[in-house]
Amino acid sequence: MRKLFLIMNALIFSGCLGMPKSVKPVSDFELDRYLGKWYEIARLDHSFERGLSQVTAEYSLRSDGGVLVLNRGFSDADNKWKEAEGKAYFVNKNSEGYLKVSFFGPFYGSYVVFGLDHENYQYAFVSGPNLDYLWLLARTPTVETEIIQKFIEMSEARGFDTENLIFVQQK
């Protein structure tokens, strides 16, 4: 099952280093402050996370200067945890929230931070290569309604279909 999870990530993200025209990565991005554990608060549905709850992403430095990515979620249907380990690297400059991420071999997809709590790094709004990929991440399992509303407003303004957001169950 883990192999299927990794293969799906690879197929979906292979060769997808663009971003929606309406999305602009944040500037003044500080990787050191972004590292650590993030909880997935909301997302658009896609096959490689379908049915998962308690989803988290952990980012740490790799010895080659890149970022180690560990995504984890619980499958109620299988009654077990699923994990995917990947790597990420900046696409342009390291002060811009635009990275490429790979969970399988040489295949990379876009990871674009377009909204960020610059002051405390407590939440992030993330896009993939097109308007089908959208996440709200936070340092805590829940966030204030104002943050969710800001996420929805910013995402709608960029053309994302927020009517289909999945709010992730966190324990």
Predicted segments — roles?
Residues 4-13:
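Sec-dependent N-terminal signal peptides
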Residues 16-171:
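A beta-rich soluble binding module of mature secreted/lumenal proteins
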